[in-house]
Amino acid sequence: MHHHHHHGGSGHPESNTPEKEVPSVIARHVSQYACQRKTTLNNYNKKFTDALEIMAENYKFKENLQACLEAKRAASILKSLPFEVTSMKDIQGLPCITDDVRDVIEEIIEEGESSRVKEILNDERYKAFKQFTSVFGVGVKTSEKWYRMGLRTVEEAKASKSLKLSKMQKAGFLYYEDLASGVSKEEADAVTLIVKETVALVVPDALVTIAGGFRRGKPMGHDVDLLITNPGRPEDDELLHKVVDLLKKQGLLLYEDIRESTFVEGQLPSPKIDALDNFQKCFAILKLYRPKVDNSAVGTSKKSDMAEVKDWKAVRVDLVITPFEQFAYALLGWTGSGQFRRDLRRYAEEERDMLLDNHRLYDLKKGIFLSAGSEEEIFGHLGLDYLEPWERNA
């Protein structure tokens, strides 16, 4: 079954262009799996999906993971629709729409906004958790602790003398403004170039590939995911350490946390949909020097103003070392989106009897690992039509 939107040419009389096609006809054919839907950044239903994502986040803060997943799934489905939802008829027959979600959509159609979401945005706990989790190294568990201590804002947490902070959280506070401001495509490209040049000094023929939202065509992100793979050579555990040392020597490394590989040859992919991967990797914060701007002001400024003129920005970077034979799987996993990756794994298991993770694909029926040299081959193994990275913004 191909649950793609009929964009003409499939021989059915009803498959006109999406404009002419009745929304309810489209809705009935939408797959429950993001890996069978094209989802570009062109979202006709932003007012609905924004609301559902706030709901999902609130559920996450309350650690109600099932409800969180349901709201996220519904948002993802609405993102894929080639038309704007204007009546409840439009969503008839869509998969994965819970009553919870339906109520929110209905109210937005009727009132233009959701009272439920307004409530969340005004909720003291939600607002505090939203602030806390925007700090690098702070998750729901830590937020919970800080909230119980009576803290409500990043400012208050920063000023608190009684917090035991991890190395990660200290860096998160130290570079908070920079990290919270997000990363532009230009900044991501500049970071990629720095890493490419540094890697080339260690291994000239290694490949550095940007993944994540930027590979999916997003103009902004909150970090830069870079995969480093070395086609010509067996794995070298030292490559990452050498690259990190060189970045340090150049004075470009503000923070690093290296995790060694935990990959076990021959082990089956984890059946957990959200399992982390086992690659050797470094979570880092890089010092990105800003392009020199008009310097006339700087020359005349007194020493006290110099603090204002910080000529660099802290940027979050993940460096991931991927063995060449696992590269296609790593690229597919790290390109995302998160929802796309989750649904791809779910599809593999539920529809194909296969286990997929960021390292490999295992066919449970045949009892073999399926190798792949490209993302296209992985889609092929799964019997899926290929989706370009920019069509995976689920």
Pin down the residues of each PLM region.
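Low-complexity, Ser/Pro/Thr/Glu/Lys-rich regulatory segments of predominantly eukaryotic nuclear proteins
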Residues: 126-129
